[in-house]
Amino acid sequence: MELRKPDFYDTFHCIAACCPDSCCKEWDVAVDEEKAALYRALPGALGEKLREFLQDEDGDTYLTLDNGRCPMWRADGLCRIQTELGEHALCNTCRDFPRLRHDYGSFTELGLELSCPESARILLSRDGWSWVSQGKAEEKTDYDQRDMDLLLKTRQAAMDLVTGAEEPLSALLLYTYHAQAILDGEEEAPFDLPAAMETAGDLAGPGNREAFLKVFRDLEILTEPWRKRLESPSPRPLQKEDRALLRYLISRYWLQAVSDFDLVCRGKLIVSLALLCRILGGDAVQTAQLMSKEIENDAENIDALLDGAYTAPGLTDANLLALTRE
C-alpha cells in the first residue's frame, strides 16, 4: 500500500493546555468498540465516570458532554484517561485527531484537520507544500485507474491555479467545470485562464450575500459564537491565508469525486467554504478553524452543502462568481 502525506504532516504536535480552543468540548466523541469495552470494564472512580457518560446510539458509542465539556477533561487542560492510563488507552478519535486518513484503495493519503487551532496555524501559514510518498500503490481498485489519474492531475493543477491566479476563487470554480469535462471523457485541453475570467464576468449576477449566508445559517450550528459570526459578517480582501485554505480544501475533497464522478459539487463546496471565511472576516486563521469545526466536522453539514450545490439559491454559479469578485 502506498502512503502519501504532506511534507509538513509530521511537524504537528498537540499543544494541549496551551491550545486557544479545545477538541475536548462542544462535541460528543465517537468511541471505537475496543475502547468502549475497556472503559465499561474499568474499575474505580475513572470507570464509574466513563460509564456515566458513555451512550449508545444507532449502533455507535459516544462519550457525551458534561456541561459542554468532555467529562475526562481536567481543569489543567489535560485528559484524565491519558494521564491515568496512558496514551494507548485513548479511543481512536482522540488518539488520531486532528490527523486525517483517506483510503483510496490503491493508496492512502494522510492530512491534518483544519478544525484544530495548531494544525490550522500550520496549514494556513504555508505558501505551498508537496506530497511525500512511501510504499507501492496496489493495482486492484474499485475504480478505473484512468479516473483517479485524471483527478490527481487536475487536483495538482487546481492547487497551482489558486496559488497564482489573481482571482483564485472564481478561477477555481470555472476550472472545476473544465476538469469535470475531462473526467466525463472530453479531450484534454489547456485551461485558458484569461478566457475563463472573461466568462466569469459574463456569468456573474448582481450578487446576493444574504442568500449565500442563509445556506450556512440553515445548517446545524454548534456554538453561539459561530451563530453570531454568521449574523454579523465583516468582509475582508483576499489574503495569502485564503490561498492556503483553498489548497487545503482542494487536497481534502477533490479526489472524493472518484466515488460518483461529481467534481462540480465538490468544487462548489471548496469555493463556498473559502468564500464564507472571507465574507465573515476577522482573523483568517481563527475564522477558518471555527468554520471547519462547525461545518467540516459535521458530516450532515457537508452533505447538505454538497446537495445544495445545484439547488440552493445562494450557491448558484452566478451568485458565487459575483461574490468571489467583490
Locations of regions flagged by a protein language model:
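Hydrophobic, aromatic-lined core segments that form the binding pocket/scaffold
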Residues: D160-E326
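Short, charged/polar micro-motifs that form catalytic or ligand-binding hotspots
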Residues: C14, E84, D144, M148, ...
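Active-site-adjacent structural elements in folded domains
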Residues: Y9, D142, F261
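Long, low-complexity, compositionally biased intrinsically disordered regions
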Residues: M1-D21, E26, G105, E118-A120, ...
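Immediate flanking context of iron-sulfur cluster ligation sites
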Residues: M1-C19, F53-C91, T108
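Structured loops at beta-to-helix junctions and adjacent beta-edge loops in soluble globular domains
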Residues: A17, W27, W73, Q82, ...
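Internal, well-ordered alpha/beta segment that forms a basic, Gly-enriched binding/recognition surface
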Residues: G77, L85-L169
